[in-house]
């Protein structure tokens, strides 16, 4: 998985953020403690797999906001994918999954979030457990 773009809206410590990784071979995320470095990786994990270190689903929503959204574009294999996950406070989660075709994104979204999640896993050939146990070391889990 090669990140291309990441947009956050009211996700954890971020109100608005847009990052463009296109053309980068290596990216270094650095900053002071509490600056939100881990939140960027949590955003990617939450967008793609719906999992985060937050205690409840609503805990990913920035304090005082009504909803959080992560829009993540990445390359996997020879395809460009886009995942948009939105969580509304005390309500529901929506999930969109798209693949780029002829310069435009085409929807691969299913009727239910669970079905769309299975489609994502099928395309990536990697579930959440495989990802966190092989490619991603979450904060506080370095034991």
Question: Model-found features: residue ranges?
Answer:
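Extreme N-terminal "head/tail" segments of very large remodeling/mechanoenzyme assemblies
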Residues: 1-118, 122-133
């Amino acid at each position: 998985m090669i990140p291309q773009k990441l947009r956050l809206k009211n996700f954890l410590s971020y109100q608005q953020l847009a990052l463009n990784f296109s053309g980068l071979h290596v990216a270094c995320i650095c900053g002071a403690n509490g600056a939100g470095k881990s939140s960027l990786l949590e955003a990617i994990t939450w967008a793609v797999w719906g999992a985060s270190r937050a205690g409840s689903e609503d805990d990913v929503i920035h304090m005082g906001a009504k909803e959080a959204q992560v829009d993540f574009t990445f390359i996997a294999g020879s395809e460009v994918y886009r995942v948009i996950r939105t969580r509304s406070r005390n309500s529901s989660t929506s999930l969109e999954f798209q693949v780029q075709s002829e310069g435009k994104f085409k929807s691969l979204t299913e009727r239910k979030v669970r079905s769309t999640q299975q489609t994502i896993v099928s395309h990536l050939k990697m579930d959440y457990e495989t990802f966190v146990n092989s490619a991603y070391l979450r904060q506080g889990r370095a034991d």
